Protein backbone atom coordinates (compact mmCIF):
# COMPACT_ATOMS: atom_id res chain seq x y z
CA UNK A 1 0.00 0.00 0.00
CA UNK A 2 1.34 3.42 -0.99
CA UNK A 3 2.32 5.72 1.85
CA UNK A 4 -0.19 8.54 2.35
CA UNK A 5 2.23 11.25 3.47
CA UNK A 6 -0.42 13.91 4.06
CA UNK A 7 -2.46 11.58 6.25
CA UNK A 8 0.56 10.66 8.39
CA UNK A 9 1.56 14.30 8.84
CA UNK A 10 -1.97 15.21 9.89
CA UNK A 11 -2.23 12.30 12.31
CA UNK A 12 1.06 13.29 13.97
CA UNK A 13 0.14 17.00 13.99
CA UNK A 14 3.28 17.96 12.05
CA UNK A 15 3.21 21.58 10.85
CA UNK A 16 5.13 21.00 7.64
CA UNK A 17 4.33 24.48 6.27
CA UNK A 18 6.61 26.08 8.89
CA UNK A 19 9.73 25.35 6.85
CA UNK A 20 9.89 21.58 7.24
CA UNK A 21 8.82 20.60 3.72
CA UNK A 22 12.32 19.54 2.70
CA UNK A 23 12.84 17.60 5.92
CA UNK A 24 9.70 15.47 5.95
CA UNK A 25 10.40 13.58 2.75
CA UNK A 26 8.69 10.33 1.85
CA UNK A 27 11.62 8.38 3.32
CA UNK A 28 11.47 10.43 6.52
CA UNK A 29 7.75 9.94 6.90
CA UNK A 30 8.22 6.20 6.40
CA UNK A 31 10.87 6.34 9.13
CA UNK A 32 8.28 7.90 11.45
CA UNK A 33 5.70 5.28 10.55
CA UNK A 34 8.21 2.59 11.47
CA UNK A 35 9.03 4.27 14.79
CA UNK A 36 5.39 4.70 15.70
CA UNK A 37 4.67 1.08 14.79
CA UNK A 38 7.43 0.08 17.21
CA UNK A 39 6.06 2.08 20.15
CA UNK A 40 2.31 1.73 19.52
CA UNK A 41 1.91 -1.16 21.95
CA UNK A 42 3.60 0.82 24.73
CA UNK A 43 1.97 3.42 26.91
CA UNK A 44 4.21 6.27 25.81
CA UNK A 45 4.55 9.99 26.39
CA UNK A 46 3.90 12.71 25.35
CA UNK A 47 0.50 12.44 23.67
CA UNK A 48 0.67 11.81 19.94
CA UNK A 49 -0.46 15.37 19.19
CA UNK A 50 2.52 16.81 21.09
CA UNK A 51 5.37 14.59 19.87
CA UNK A 52 6.27 16.96 17.04
CA UNK A 53 5.39 20.15 18.85
CA UNK A 54 8.70 21.66 17.76
CA UNK A 55 7.22 22.16 14.27
CA UNK A 56 4.96 24.88 15.70
CA UNK A 57 7.88 27.29 15.38
CA UNK A 58 8.74 28.33 11.81
CA UNK A 59 12.34 27.38 11.09
CA UNK A 60 13.23 30.92 10.04
CA UNK A 61 11.95 32.29 13.38
CA UNK A 62 14.01 30.03 15.65
CA UNK A 63 16.50 32.03 17.73
CA UNK A 64 17.51 29.49 20.36
CA UNK A 65 17.11 25.75 20.95
CA UNK A 66 17.37 24.47 24.52
CA UNK A 67 18.23 20.80 24.10
CA UNK A 68 16.93 18.11 26.44
CA UNK A 69 17.35 14.34 26.27
CA UNK A 70 14.01 12.53 26.46
CA UNK A 71 10.50 13.32 27.74
CA UNK A 72 9.48 12.77 31.35
CA UNK A 73 8.35 9.16 31.86
CA UNK A 74 6.23 10.14 34.87
CA UNK A 75 2.53 10.93 35.03
CA UNK A 76 -0.35 11.84 37.30
CA UNK A 77 -3.88 10.53 37.55
CA UNK A 78 -6.69 12.70 36.25
CA UNK A 79 -9.13 11.72 39.00
CA UNK A 80 -9.40 10.01 42.36
CA UNK A 81 -10.35 6.69 40.75
CA UNK A 82 -6.91 6.60 39.14
CA UNK A 83 -8.32 5.30 35.88
CA UNK A 84 -6.88 7.86 33.47
CA UNK A 85 -3.29 9.03 33.48
CA UNK A 86 -2.03 12.44 32.42
CA UNK A 87 1.59 12.56 31.25
CA UNK A 88 3.98 15.14 32.68
CA UNK A 89 5.64 15.36 29.26
CA UNK A 90 4.32 18.14 27.02
CA UNK A 91 6.49 17.84 23.92
CA UNK A 92 8.80 20.59 25.17
CA UNK A 93 12.00 19.78 27.03
CA UNK A 94 11.93 20.57 30.77
CA UNK A 95 8.26 21.64 30.86
CA UNK A 96 6.11 19.84 33.45
CA UNK A 97 2.46 19.41 32.50
CA UNK A 98 1.04 19.49 36.04
CA UNK A 99 2.88 22.67 37.08
CA UNK A 100 0.56 25.66 36.90
CA UNK A 101 2.40 28.02 39.25
CA UNK A 102 5.98 28.32 40.46
CA UNK A 103 4.74 27.67 43.98
CA UNK A 104 3.60 24.16 43.00
CA UNK A 105 5.89 21.39 44.17
CA UNK A 106 8.68 20.94 41.61
CA UNK A 107 9.93 17.37 41.69
CA UNK A 108 12.13 17.85 38.62
CA UNK A 109 15.49 19.29 39.68
CA UNK A 110 16.11 20.64 36.17
CA UNK A 111 13.11 22.96 36.30
CA UNK A 112 13.99 24.05 39.85
CA UNK A 113 17.46 25.08 38.75
CA UNK A 114 16.18 26.77 35.61
CA UNK A 115 14.04 29.00 37.85
CA UNK A 116 17.01 29.64 40.16
CA UNK A 117 19.19 30.51 37.18
CA UNK A 118 16.63 32.97 35.85
CA UNK A 119 16.52 34.63 39.26
CA UNK A 120 20.32 34.78 39.20
CA UNK A 121 20.19 36.34 35.72
CA UNK A 122 17.96 39.16 36.95
CA UNK A 123 19.48 39.79 40.40
CA UNK A 124 23.03 38.41 40.32
CA UNK A 125 22.17 36.47 43.48
CA UNK A 126 21.95 32.74 44.10
CA UNK A 127 18.90 32.11 46.27
CA UNK A 128 16.95 29.18 47.67
CA UNK A 129 13.82 28.03 45.89
CA UNK A 130 11.70 28.98 48.89
CA UNK A 131 13.00 32.56 48.90
CA UNK A 132 12.46 32.89 45.15
CA UNK A 133 8.89 31.70 45.54
CA UNK A 134 8.31 34.27 48.28
CA UNK A 135 9.63 37.01 45.99
CA UNK A 136 7.38 35.82 43.15
CA UNK A 137 4.34 35.83 45.46
CA UNK A 138 5.17 39.31 46.80
CA UNK A 139 5.78 40.74 43.33
CA UNK A 140 9.47 41.44 43.98
CA UNK A 141 10.48 39.00 41.25
CA UNK A 142 8.35 38.88 38.12
CA UNK A 143 8.20 35.85 35.87
CA UNK A 144 5.29 34.45 33.92
CA UNK A 145 3.60 31.32 35.26
CA UNK A 146 5.23 28.09 33.99
CA UNK A 147 3.00 27.29 31.00
CA UNK A 148 2.73 30.95 30.02
CA UNK A 149 6.52 31.19 30.30
CA UNK A 150 7.10 28.30 27.90
CA UNK A 151 4.45 29.64 25.50
CA UNK A 152 5.89 33.15 25.58
CA UNK A 153 9.41 31.94 24.89
CA UNK A 154 8.15 29.76 22.05
CA UNK A 155 6.49 32.83 20.54
CA UNK A 156 9.86 34.59 20.66
CA UNK A 157 11.58 31.73 18.85
CA UNK A 158 12.89 29.61 21.73
CA UNK A 159 12.51 25.90 21.02
CA UNK A 160 12.60 23.38 23.86
CA UNK A 161 13.67 20.24 22.00
CA UNK A 162 14.27 16.74 23.29
CA UNK A 163 16.60 14.70 21.11
CA UNK A 164 14.40 11.68 21.87
CA UNK A 165 10.76 12.47 21.19
CA UNK A 166 8.95 9.70 23.07
CA UNK A 167 9.41 7.58 26.17
CA UNK A 168 7.73 4.49 27.60
CA UNK A 169 5.76 5.05 30.79
CA UNK A 170 8.00 4.70 33.86
CA UNK A 171 11.06 3.85 31.74
CA UNK A 172 13.32 6.89 31.16
CA UNK A 173 15.61 6.47 28.16
CA UNK A 174 13.56 3.59 26.75
CA UNK A 175 13.15 5.06 23.25
CA UNK A 176 16.44 6.92 22.81
CA UNK A 177 17.93 4.56 20.24
CA UNK A 178 14.74 4.67 18.18
CA UNK A 179 15.10 8.41 17.62
CA UNK A 180 18.88 8.78 17.22
CA UNK A 181 18.99 8.92 13.42
CA UNK A 182 15.92 11.11 13.15
CA UNK A 183 17.21 13.56 15.76
CA UNK A 184 20.67 13.84 14.22
CA UNK A 185 19.14 14.58 10.82
CA UNK A 186 16.78 17.15 12.39
CA UNK A 187 19.64 18.96 14.12
CA UNK A 188 21.63 19.12 10.88
CA UNK A 189 18.58 20.34 8.98
CA UNK A 190 17.75 23.13 11.44
CA UNK A 191 21.38 24.23 11.63
CA UNK A 192 21.65 24.34 7.83
CA UNK A 193 18.38 26.17 7.25
CA UNK A 194 18.94 28.66 10.08
CA UNK A 195 22.66 28.90 10.91
CA UNK A 196 22.03 31.77 13.35
CA UNK A 197 20.31 29.50 15.88
CA UNK A 198 21.98 29.51 19.29
CA UNK A 199 21.98 26.02 20.77
CA UNK A 200 22.01 25.59 24.55
CA UNK A 201 23.74 22.24 25.07
CA UNK A 202 23.33 21.41 28.73
CA UNK A 203 25.43 18.48 29.89
CA UNK A 204 27.99 16.19 28.31
CA UNK A 205 25.42 13.99 26.58
CA UNK A 206 24.03 16.88 24.53
CA UNK A 207 27.46 18.37 23.94
CA UNK A 208 28.97 15.11 22.70
CA UNK A 209 25.96 14.26 20.56
CA UNK A 210 25.29 17.63 18.96
CA UNK A 211 28.26 19.94 19.52
CA UNK A 212 30.04 19.06 16.29
CA UNK A 213 26.87 19.48 14.20
CA UNK A 214 25.96 23.08 15.00
CA UNK A 215 27.45 26.52 14.40
CA UNK A 216 26.61 28.37 17.60
CA UNK A 217 26.66 26.30 20.76
CA UNK A 218 26.41 27.46 24.37
CA UNK A 219 27.79 24.68 26.56
CA UNK A 220 26.78 24.47 30.20
CA UNK A 221 26.17 21.97 32.98
CA UNK A 222 22.96 19.99 32.90
CA UNK A 223 20.14 21.88 34.68
CA UNK A 224 19.80 19.12 37.26
CA UNK A 225 23.22 20.19 38.63
CA UNK A 226 23.55 23.19 40.96
CA UNK A 227 26.46 24.53 38.88
CA UNK A 228 23.95 25.34 36.12
CA UNK A 229 22.50 28.18 38.21
CA UNK A 230 25.56 30.45 38.12
CA UNK A 231 26.63 29.38 34.64
CA UNK A 232 23.29 30.84 33.50
CA UNK A 233 23.34 30.19 29.73
CA UNK A 234 20.35 32.48 29.27
CA UNK A 235 22.59 35.55 29.54
CA UNK A 236 24.44 34.46 26.39
CA UNK A 237 21.34 34.26 24.18
CA UNK A 238 20.55 37.36 22.13
CA UNK A 239 17.26 39.25 22.03
CA UNK A 240 15.12 37.11 24.31
CA UNK A 241 12.91 38.39 27.14
CA UNK A 242 13.27 35.50 29.58
CA UNK A 243 10.76 36.82 32.11
CA UNK A 244 7.77 38.25 30.28
CA UNK A 245 8.50 41.84 31.23
CA UNK A 246 7.32 43.15 27.87
CA UNK A 247 3.95 41.49 28.50
CA UNK A 248 3.83 42.98 32.00
CA UNK A 249 4.31 46.48 30.64
Task: For each feature predicted by the language model, list its residue ranges.
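Short loop/helix-cap segments at secondary-structure boundaries that form the rim of catalytic
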Residues: 208-214
